[in-house]
Structures are given as structure tokens and as C-alpha cells.
Amino acid sequence: MIPEGTRFLLPPEARLKAEVVGKLQHLFRRHGYEPVELPALELYDPDHPLAERAFKLVDKTGEVLALRSEFTTLLAKLLRAHLGEGAHRFQYAGPLWLREADAELGRLREYTQVGLELLGATGPLADAEVLELAFAALEALGVQGEVEVGLPSLVGEVLKASGLPEALQRRAQQAIHRKNLPELKGLLAESPVPEEARKVLLALPDLYGGREVLKEARGLPLPPKAQEALAQLERTLDLLGRPVLLDLGMARRYEYYSGIFFRAYTPGFGLPLLGGGRYDGALFPKAAGFALGVERLLEALRLPKEEEPPEVLALDLKALRRFARERRTELFHGEDPVAYARRRGIPFLARGEELFRVEEA
């Protein structure tokens, strides 16, 4: 009936999905993030990071198009010529499509993201703002979450200073990210590495925990740029004033993320609910942001099994118009409204301008 990897949502889940998206949009708007609307179709770019997994189409002129596979790159292309100096705040929401999606709640090929971008601002205060909104997003949804913060740029600076050939650097980065110490030791044995760099590289996978991890990292012979990145992270966390889980061996896309990278998890659910970070220079001179996966959030929220009943059962259109402005109201179609209301737990009936309790009917 529908393609594999897509979903048909009935009212309980569709309603909750709309509420989740609406709460996030309202939260971001309150913090100055204005909405933008992006086209679902874009010109196909073979250099796009998700080009191989995008749905491609050909129009009647022969031009190759692609369904939107992520928001940040497209937003950067469209905004680059329109922004002046200073900080700019944007939010987005909508569906994305991937032809070969990663295994996630099955294999979704159509999924929804809500996210934000802070452009034109950098430094600890800007990073703290984005992190604070990640916490606030989870709180707005009533999701108990733990935010994990990494510093891929630190790993990148250590690898650059190691003198390893580029191919070995990439393999070492993957081993550090996976915390595979035996593999990392084997890679370092393939090429001469200064003892100080070797010591730092072997320590990175174990730099995981609370703020005490920063003290451990400061005790290592880090190259100057890595020391600077660590100091920036410490200042960011001081400004944030919230507990986070630090993973200084997190090396995901270190060539893309120029500063922090973070993601959030909730107990009993193994996939990250959100992810983001700072990517100065990748698409904008100064940029940071994050996105939340709505389908993952819905799963983590453990959907209610039963649909929430309306507050009012309207017996005519006049009552529907009158009370739907203030309460959740449903128009009745049938022969016995009292029995129907009692069965569904609807507390009020309405006729015209009159509202009365079911037990009084």
C-alpha cells in the first residue's frame, strides 16, 4: 500500500507528532529563532555528503534533481548571499528522504527533523546557547535526557601533530571514535610517531566521563591548538552550568566540526535523539546548530495506547464553532450522544451556545 520505509500515522500518533513539532518550534521562536521554509527538491550535487543515498529525479529538461536529504547544506546555499554582519538565528522543520537510510526504527526512508542554526556567532557563549537549547528542547517534551559532548577538533589537532600519513590518520580517527585500543596500537606501530603524540592518542579513547575528564586532558602533552580547543570547551561548560557527559575521544567527522559536537540520549533508548555542533568554515564562517529526529522522539516518548478523548461533544455546528475555539471539541454523528460520550469519557455535551455535563443530560 505504501513504500517500504515510509509511515501512515493514525490520529493518536499523528496528533503527538504534530504536538512535538509544535512545542519545539514554539520553544525556538521564544529564543529568537525564526522559521524558514526550504524546498523539498534541490539541484543534485554529486559532491553533497549524502549524494550517494539521495533520491534522484530527472525533469523534462533533463536536469537532475534530488529530494532534500538534510537541511543544513541546503540552508547554507540559500542563505549565504542574504546575511549581513552579526548573529542570525533560524529554525526549520519538515520531512527528509534518503534512498538508503541507516537502520533506525526499521529502515526509514522518509523521516522528520526539527532543528536550528545560529549563524554569525562563535565562541563559548554561542556554543553554550546552542547547548542550552538542546537541553530545553528535551525538557519541553518531558524527555529525560543526557547530553554527551565531544571535541572532534581536539582529536583532529592531535592527529595532525602526530606526523602520521593521512590514510593512517583516518584509520586512527575511526579506531579512537570506536574506542578500539588494540586496533589503535596496531596502527601506531605501522609508522613512527613522536612519543608525546603517541601518549595522547592512546589516552583519547579513555577520556570519557564528567568534568574530571577535562583535568585528565589538561595533564596530557597536547599540541597548542588542541589546548586552545580544550580551554574553549571548559569555558563553554562553565557558561552552560549544566551537567554533561564528556567524550573527548569522540572523533566523528573531525574535518567538518571545528569545535564541539554533541548528542543526547534517553534511558532505555539506544539511538541519539538529537545531534549537532560547531562547524565554522565548513558552510559558513561562523555556524553552529543541531537537529532532533522526530520519529526517534516519538519512540522515546512511548506513545499512549488510547486516543485522548475530546472535552466537548458538539451536537450541532453552532456548538462546534462556539466551543472549538476554547476546548478540544468533536462533532457528534449518531443516535445516542450521551451513551457515546460516557463510553469515550467525554465530560461535556454542547448544543448551540449551551454547555452541560454528560451526567446532567
Curated annotation (Swiss-Prot):
Which Pfam families does the record cross-reference, listed alphabetically? tRNA-synt_His
Q: Does the keyword Cytoplasm apply?
A: yes
A GO cellular component term found in this entry reads: cytoplasm
The superkingdom of the source organism is Bacteria
Q: Could you tell me one molecular function GO term of this UniProt entry?
A: histidine-tRNA ligase activity
Q: Under which pathway is this protein filed?
A: Amino-acid biosynthesis; L-histidine biosynthesis; L-histidine from 5-phospho-alpha-D-ribose 1-diphosphate: step 1/9
Keywords, comma-separated and alphabetical? Amino-acid biosynthesis, Cytoplasm, Histidine biosynthesis
Instruction: From the Swiss-Prot or TrEMBL record, state where the protein is found.
Output: Cytoplasm
GO BP, one example?
Answer: L-histidine biosynthetic process
- Is Ribosomal protein one of the keywords UniProt gives this record? no
Q: How does it assemble?
A: Heteromultimer composed of HisG and HisZ subunits.
What does the miscellaneous comment read?
A: This function is generally fulfilled by the C-terminal part of HisG, which is missing in some bacteria such as this one.
Q: Which family does it belong to?
A: Belongs to the class-II aminoacyl-tRNA synthetase family. HisZ subfamily.
Report the function annotation for this chain.
Required for the first step of histidine biosynthesis. May allow the feedback regulation of ATP phosphoribosyltransferase activity by histidine.
Instruction: Output this protein's name.
Output: ATP phosphoribosyltransferase regulatory subunit
Species name for this entry?
Thermus thermophilus (strain ATCC 27634 / DSM 579 / HB8)
Q: What is the lineage of its organism?
A: Bacteria, Thermotogati, Deinococcota, Deinococci, Thermales
